[in-house]
Amino acid sequence: QEGDAAKGEKEFNKCKACHMVQAPDGTDIVKGGKTGPNLYGVVGRKIASEEGFKYGDGILEVAEKNPDLVWTEADLIEYVTDPKPWLVEKTGDSAAKTKMTFKLGKNQADVVAFLAQNSPDAGAEAAPAEDAAD
C-alpha cells in the first residue's frame, strides 16, 4: 500500500506531541516533543539506534535479538498501528512492553511515506526502481 507523503505530513500532527523530525544540521522539519525519538531518517535506520535517546526495554530487546534489523516502511506501518503485537512478534516475548502507548488507527501508510521522504537512507526500500525499463 503506497502512502501519500503530503497527507502524511498533516497526519503527523498526531505524532508531534512526542516526536520531532529534525535534520542532522538542526533544521526542524516538524517541531515536536522529545518523549519519543527524533524520526528524521527513521526509514532505513537500525532499530532503537537514535543517538542519545533512552529507549524502553521492549524495543531494546528487538534490537538485541535482531541486530541487523532496520526500520522498513512495512514494519513502521505495523508498529504505529499497534506497537505491542509488533514487539511480541519480533522478540518472541509475550510480556514485551512498549513505551509507545499511542496507536495510529488510520492513514499509517501516509505517515510512513512522509517519514520515508525525510529518511536519506530509505534507499531502494522507499523508492520504486524506475530505471528498470531503460
Curated annotation (Swiss-Prot):
For binding heme c, which residues are annotated in this chain's numbering?
C15, C18, H19, M100
Q: Where is the signal peptide?
A: none
| Gene3D superfamilies the UniProt entry points to | Cytochrome c-like domain
Q: What keywords tag this UniProt record? A: Electron transport, Heme, Iron, Metal-binding, Pyrrolidone carboxylic acid, Transport
Q: How is it modified after translation?
A: Binds 1 heme c group covalently per subunit.
Concerning PROSITE patterns, the annotation shows: CYTC
- Per its record, what are the GO molecular function terms? electron transfer activity; heme binding; metal ion binding
Annotated function: Electron donor for nitrous-oxide reductase.
Supply the PANTHER family for this chain: CYTOCHROME C
Name recorded for this polypeptide? Cytochrome c-550
